[in-house]
Amino acid sequence: MKRQKRDRFQRAYVHGYKAGMTGRSRDDCPSQDINLREYWMSGWREGRGDQWAGMTGISGIHKNPMVLS
């Protein structure tokens, strides 16, 4: 198997986190599915909070969900 099937909810969370860290609006959520949107928004909130706390670049690498998984 070349690559495992990834969890859609985890991917939505990670994409939301990245959007929050880069300062994108929460209205940029690409999903219309309520469950995926919920995970995306959770990631966005976490990323936005980390951005406001100054955890960007090297100082925030321990919080990056892609590094943890």
From Swiss-Prot:
Keywords: Cytoplasm, Translation regulation
Family to which the UniProt record says this protein belongs: Belongs to the ribosome modulation factor family.
InterPro entries linked: Ribosome_modulation_factor, RMF_sf
Known function: During stationary phase, converts 70S ribosomes to an inactive dimeric form (100S ribosomes).
Protein name: Ribosome modulation factor
Major subcellular location class: cytoplasm
Compartments, as annotated in UniProt: Cytoplasm
Pfam families with a match to the protein in the record: RMF
Keyword Cytoplasm annotated: yes
Record carries keyword DNA repair: no
One GO cellular component term noted in the UniProt record for this chain: cytoplasm
Gene Ontology terms: biological process: regulation of translation
Top-level taxonomic group: Bacteria
